[in-house]
């Protein structure tokens, strides 16, 4: 049992010091004459821990050990002179590795700071980092605050975007729309279904919000149980070790050895008349206290398309306004197939179009004027709801980052491979960092790994490559690895082979659902082992299909391994094992039947 290197080593050595120095302990402090009142492995470990404790309390000047002004110390360990005997070495203790770790001043023993770590942001990244840091012996506070939305004043509890206004409510409403579709398909499968069945928006919103509030509550309890101090306040830096927290009851100044910025982002609003006064964003949609009705969704990223998709499935009339391209950053062949599948379902797309203004009419409806950016032609239409989905902005403005000396790039924070900013004791994780995937699982893992490096002696870094993701449109799109365009750009068109095919889900046949856009492809190297660089899939339960293949891709999946894997029949996932036609061949990738 390697007690000196365990995650609780700091606490352990403190307790051991008390035992070793207590007159009633019955343990002689002379290393060579430990009594037999305790088993040998305990006595030797206690002696080792006592030595570690003395060194930890005395040693300063290493990276991570600073005085209250932030200056590094310069004192050598006691007893480190030329004539000092070598320290006791436990046979199972990697002392060299342990000594190489940063030495922190523990605030619980009169150190210079209120906390070892303050995490700014109570979302996925911040919570994961805070809880993991506590498990590794740090004293942690988590600062969290939500500004009300400008149009409706929407607020929410702890948990960040994903829990409150992102992944969770989005997936629930997507599921509600799929259930509505399934109900209408049920008649083809022999079910007697009332033709007048329709969703109740208010009941759906209430159910979604009840679930969110339960998650908020569980999260608060979890933070309390794990001894993370939760501070509901807006934080701004005074200097690199001091934060001013604005609370409901006033202000509070708090200090920490280390800060992790995990504030995430919020939706952008266009700079046009009426945008803020009358438009809403995804921050408002999932708690909207009225039916959305005829809705203009401005923006064709994944948020805009997902919202338009479930609104259509719930019986409303969405229109998508696209300034340039659909699903920027994704494989564009797949993106256009997704858009085409939505148009087939009756969702209009206004291409190459931007909004000019939003006006509220006497009847409460919204008059939107817009323009085609290619022809200059202007037009207008009336909607019940205007939903802005034009991108997100990092929440850096309220942090007063210049006071701490932290660099900002395009409202995001640039970091190195260890999530460190340009300031030695300040880190950033999650959606706030520049140039990394803005996905909840990425944020969670990055936050945990950062805490383990800071307080657990780990060296593992976050791997941001080949991260799988899913767009929850009516016909879902999931992918992992490189898009076809990026693979060509990185390796050259002559070095890339694309295996592709359309397929026919068995469950689509009886209700006679369209299979026109059920498509998948594997982007691979053309020669050699034909390693797979990217996998792309459009169809039902896309996220469930791609997850396992994501692990295979990260493990070095090749085309030969893929096509020689025996598939599970009949499933849509097995279609990846049947990819045999390349784009270069020019052959028709459309199957004759579900089993061909």
Swiss-Prot record:
Resulting phenotype, residue 574 to A: Reduced Trx reduction
Entry binding sites for FAD: 120-126, 143-147, 159-170, 233-235, 262-266, 282, 286, 302, 392-399, 429-432, 438-443, 472, 570
* Tissue expression per record: During embryogenesis, expression is seen in germ cell progenitors, developing midgut, hindgut and proventriculus.
Which key words are in the record? Cytoplasm, Disulfide bond, FAD, Flavoprotein, Mitochondrion, NADP, Nucleotide-binding, Oxidoreductase, Redox-active center, Transit peptide
Biophysicochemical property: pH dependence = Optimum pH is 7.6 for isoform A with Trx2 and NADPH as substrates.
Which GO annotations describe the biological process of this protein? cell redox homeostasis; determination of adult lifespan
Cofactor list:
FAD
Q: Which InterPro entries match?
A: FAD/NAD-bd_sf (IPR036188), FAD/NAD-binding_dom (IPR023753), FAD/NAD-linked_Rdtase_dimer_sf (IPR016156), GSHR/TRXR-like (IPR046952), Pyr_nuc-diS_OxRdtase (IPR001100), Pyr_nucl-diS_OxRdtase_dimer (IPR004099), Pyr_OxRdtase_I_AS (IPR012999), Thioredoxin/glutathione_Rdtase (IPR006338)
CC annotations in GO: cytoplasm; cytosol; mitochondrion
* Binding, NADP(+): 322-328, 355
Query: What reactions does this protein catalyze?
Result: [thioredoxin]-dithiol + NADP(+) = [thioredoxin]-disulfide + NADPH + H(+)
Bias class Low complexity marks the residues at: 68-79
Q: List the disulfide bonds.
A: 162-167, 594-595
Q: Where is the active site?
A: 569 (proton acceptor)
Top-rank taxon of the source lineage equals: Eukaryota
**EC number in record:** 1.8.1.9
Give GO terms: molecular function aspect only.
antioxidant activity; flavin adenine dinucleotide binding; protein homodimerization activity; thioredoxin-disulfide reductase (NADPH) activity
Cofactor notes = Binds 1 FAD per subunit.
- Chain spans, region Disordered: 59-87
The record's misc note reads: The active site is a redox-active disulfide bond.
PANTHER family assigned: GLUTATHIONE REDUCTASE (PTHR42737), THIOREDOXIN-DISULFIDE REDUCTASE (PTHR42737:SF7)
Q: How does it assemble?
A: Homodimer.
Physiological role: Thioredoxin system is a major player in glutathione metabolism, due to the demonstrated absence of a glutathione reductase. Functionally interacts with the Sod/Cat reactive oxidation species (ROS) defense system and thereby has a role in preadult development and life span. Lack of a glutathione reductase suggests antioxidant defense in Drosophila, and probably in related insects, differs fundamentally from that in other organisms.
Name listed for the protein in its UniProt record = Thioredoxin reductase 1, mitochondrial
Give the originating organism: Drosophila melanogaster (Fruit fly)
Q: What is the lineage of its organism?
A: Eukaryota, Metazoa, Ecdysozoa, Arthropoda, Hexapoda
UniProt lists the gene as Trxr1
């Amino acid at each position: 049992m390697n007690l000196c290197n365990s995650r609780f080593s700091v606490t352990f050595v403190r307790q051991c010091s008390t035992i070793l120095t207590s007159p009633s302990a019955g343990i002689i402090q002379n290393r060579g004459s430990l009594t037999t009142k305790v088993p040998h492995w305990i006595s030797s470990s206690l002696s080792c821990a006592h030595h570690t404790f003395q060194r930890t309390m005395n040693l300063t000047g290493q990276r991570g050990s600073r005085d209250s002004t932030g200056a590094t110390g310069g004192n050598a360990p006691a007893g480190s002179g030329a004539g000092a005997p070598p320290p006791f070495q436990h046979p199972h203790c990697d002392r060299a590795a342990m000594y190489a770790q940063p030495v922190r001043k523990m605030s619980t023993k009169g150190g210079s700071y209120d906390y070892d770590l303050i995490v700014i942001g109570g979302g996925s990244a911040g919570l994961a980092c805070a809880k993991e840091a506590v498990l590794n012996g740090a004293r942690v506070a988590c600062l969290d605050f939500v500004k009300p939305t400008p149009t409706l004043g929407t607020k929410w509890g702890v948990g960040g975007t994903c829990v409150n206004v992102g992944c969770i409510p989005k997936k629930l409403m997507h599921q509600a729309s799929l259930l509505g579709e399934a109900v209408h398909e049920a008649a083809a499968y022999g079910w007697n279904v009332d033709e007048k069945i329709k969703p109740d928006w208010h009941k759906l919103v209430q159910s979604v919000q009840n679930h969110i509030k339960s998650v908020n509550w569980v999260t608060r309890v979890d933070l309390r149980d794990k001894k993370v101090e939760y501070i509901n306040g807006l934080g701004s830096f005074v200097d690199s070790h001091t934060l001013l927290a604005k609370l409901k009851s006033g202000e509070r100044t708090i200090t920490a050895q280390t800060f992790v910025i995990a504030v995430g982002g919020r939706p952008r609003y266009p700079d046009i008349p009426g945008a803020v006064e009358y438009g809403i964003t995804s921050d408002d949609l999932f708690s909207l206290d009225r039916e959305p009705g005829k809705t203009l969704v401005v923006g064709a990223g994944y948020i805009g398309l997902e919202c338009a998709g479930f609104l259509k499935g719930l019986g409303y009339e969405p229109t998508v306004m696209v300034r340039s391209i659909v699903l920027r950053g994704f494989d564009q062949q797949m993106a256009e197939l997704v858009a085409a599948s939505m148009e087939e379902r009756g969702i209009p797309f206004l291409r190459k179009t931007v909004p000019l203004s939003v006006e509220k009419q006497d009847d409460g409806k919204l008059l939107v004027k817009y323009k085609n950016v290619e022809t200059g032609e202007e037009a207008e239409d009336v909607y019940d709801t205007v939903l802005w989905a034009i991108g997100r902005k990092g929440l850096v403005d309220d942090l007063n980052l210049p006071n701490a000396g932290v660099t900002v790039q395009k409202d995001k924070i640039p970091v190195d491979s260890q999530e460190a900013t340009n300031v030695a004791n300040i880190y950033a994780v999650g959606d706030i960092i520049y140039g990394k995937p803005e996905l909840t699982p990425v944020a969670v893992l990055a936050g945990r790994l950062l805490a383990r490096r800071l307080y657990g002696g780990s060296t593992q870094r976050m791997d941001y490559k080949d991260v799988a993701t899913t767009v929850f449109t009516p016909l879902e799109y999931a992918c992992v690895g490189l898009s076809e365009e990026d693979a060509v750009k990185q390796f050259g068109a002559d070095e890339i082979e694309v295996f592709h095919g359309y397929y026919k889900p068995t469950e689509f046949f009886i209700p006679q659902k369209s299979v026109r856009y059920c498509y998948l492809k594997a982007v691979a190297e053309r020669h050699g082992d034909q390693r797979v660089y990217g996998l792309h899939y459009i169809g039902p339960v896309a996220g469930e299909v791609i997850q396992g293949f994501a692990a295979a891709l990260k493990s070095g999946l090749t085309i030969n391994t893929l096509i020689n894997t025996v598939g599970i029949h009949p499933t849509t996932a097995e279609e990846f094992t049947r990819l045999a036609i390349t784009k270069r061949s020019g052959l028709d990738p459309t199957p004759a039947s579900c089993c061909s």
